[in-house]
Amino acid sequence: MARYRNKVSCPAQCDPKLQSTGDTSWDSYATTMKTAFTPKRGMVPDLIRPKSTRRLGFTYSIGDPILNESQYHDEYTWKLRSKENMVKTGTSRGVWNHKTHPGQEFFQWTHPKGKQTQKLPWIEPPSEESIQNAVASQFISCTKRDFVDLTQSKKTMKRFPRSQDRKSLLPRPLDTEFRYNYQIPAQIPELKDFSFKYGCYASLPVASQGLVPSVLSSYIRNEERTKKQTTYECDYGKACLDFLTILDSFTPSQVHDYLQSVSYKDRQILERFIHSHCDIEAKPNKREKQSHRKRP
């Protein structure tokens, strides 16, 4: 094993790039970013502002005295006209050439000989009438300028043929718009006949005329329901009172006391009714007893 260990060479000895440079502060975990882009060391020179360009600033430096000039004053103030470079007839070699051909702007145009020059119309002095009209036109009102006189407008209207307005030919009612739209509706005479009393005409006080249908059972039932005073009587009430149920609700002593307090005639009538009621109850009891006797 020791032999093989001696034969194995170190990668730093084979690759010259990986050989140690004597720097003891070597970081084994350094990234490519750190090795390729090393931090700058040393003094960084001051940035010099160029004076030839206007975009990066003014031509003066910070230490110079501040005059009454700014970028706005430098760009937007009135400046003197720059002197144009005169055309030099000499060449680059310094030889003067007298046969120059200047441009057309150097020529001075004149009229041909024998032709009389006419005065321009705006150079002639104005007459008194034109001056008076110009002064008078300044005092014309807006209404007179915008709205023409009626007499003048009528003359202009008579020249053109007038088109007939069709709306004016339509017949118009004499009533107002409200009366025309909200007038009494036309009544049909056939609908005024109230000889029948059905539907909405059932409550009219006018007597019905003509044929009347036969009375139905539903009409009778409705009339009977209208006679009742309350809904309870209509649903749960009976046509006659059941006196037998009333008598059964009292005890014999109460009935006897009541008969003593009533007059003699009323007492006889009530006693007859009570005896008849007792006979009605006694007859079914006797029949039940006889049936029980026959069975055994």
UniProtKB/Swiss-Prot annotation:
Segments for region (Mn 3): 140-153
Mn 2: annotated segments: 69-83
Region (Mn 4): 175-189
Region (Mn 1) residue spans: 30-42
Region (Mn 5): 229-243
Protein name: Testis-expressed protein 26
Organism: Mus musculus (Mouse)
Phylogenetic placement of the source organism: Eukaryota, Metazoa, Chordata, Craniata, Vertebrata
